[in-house]
Curated annotation (Swiss-Prot):
GO BP field: cytoplasmic translation
Name the record gives this protein: Large ribosomal subunit protein eL24
Biased segments, Basic and acidic residues type: 110-123
Residue pairs linked by disulfide bridges in the UniProt entry: none
Renumbered residue ranges of the record's region Disordered: 110-156
Amino acid sequence: MKLEVCSYSGFKVYPGHGKRVIRVDGRSFYFINKKSERSHYLKRNPREISWTVLYRRKYKKGMSEEQTKNELSVLTKTARGIAGASLAEIMAKRNQKPEVRKAMRDQAIRAAKEKQKQKELEKKAKKVEKKKPTLAPKQKAAKITQKPAPRVGGKR
């Protein structure tokens, strides 16, 4: 993807945007929008128009941001302990052999599965206890209701 640069403002012009103007003498200009094209025809100096790239370069706008960005990118790494674990403990875990780590993981998984089985057994026991005292529910006697007497008279 070829990017053009606006002849007046200095902004990038992406394909499908902007306007190319070729003068009679063969010199070509590329403008990002009508505003920059009009300013060019009015012979305004882009170094004096505050929104152009040339103005920003002339008055060193945005230069301090780039410097601070570069300063921030140089970071030094320091090893510290995390809450609840000292640096020595962390390093010991890190330097463990893979076999030891795998064995510990398998043991933890086994313990978790045992705990899950225990919970399921307790649930089943509770269900069995609840089912034992089942008595036949008493049926309620149906109420006999009389139909209301028909209304005499009409609607009015």
